[in-house]
Amino acid sequence: SSSVNNLVTGFWRDKSPSLNHSVKVGSPVLLNNSQNGMPVMSYSGATSESHSFNMIEDIRTVFWVLSEDASVPNSDFRPLLGDTANEPDWLANADGNIWGTALGNSHVYNGNTRLNGSIVDGKVTAKPNNLSIISLRTLGNVQSDSFSNDRNIAGRSWHGKLAELLIYNEALSDN
């Protein structure tokens, strides 16, 4: 399919009318037939390794299928979405949990977070080490320009796998 070809070349085609395509930064690797016969991106955690796109300033709902490598220490800051210029709205506390409690944007960490469909408090729920679905409906507009790079700072890029990323500029309902 074209999406697999796009991943092979490091280019993700935005399927929305916005045409905000994403380009790989560094050397993330495509793992073919990794999950249910589908490809998965693998990120080493190297500084700046990510996929970047034009800044989206009105993010309201996001779905990820991802896992963090079990070797990542809980003391690492590795946000689920990033910002290459400013502190990411998605910044965690370096405690291994999905969201922070003070760092980042309260629209994210006080939003409606689900892990594999169950409502969780992302401030006290660890990032999954097996491919899992995380969804978030924020309390207001937040922004990002990458998966997942925090200002090109060492130890602040994703170290794990990403199978799916969907970003919406509207707060989707639970129905």
Stretch-by-stretch model annotation:
Residues S1, N116, S148-N149, Y168:
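Predominantly extracellular/luminal cell-surface or secreted proteins
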Residues H51-F53, D121-T125:
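Beta-strand-rich interaction surfaces with strong enrichment in secreted/lumenal proteins
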Residues N129, R156, G160:
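Structured loop/turn residues at beta-strand edges in well-structured enzyme cores
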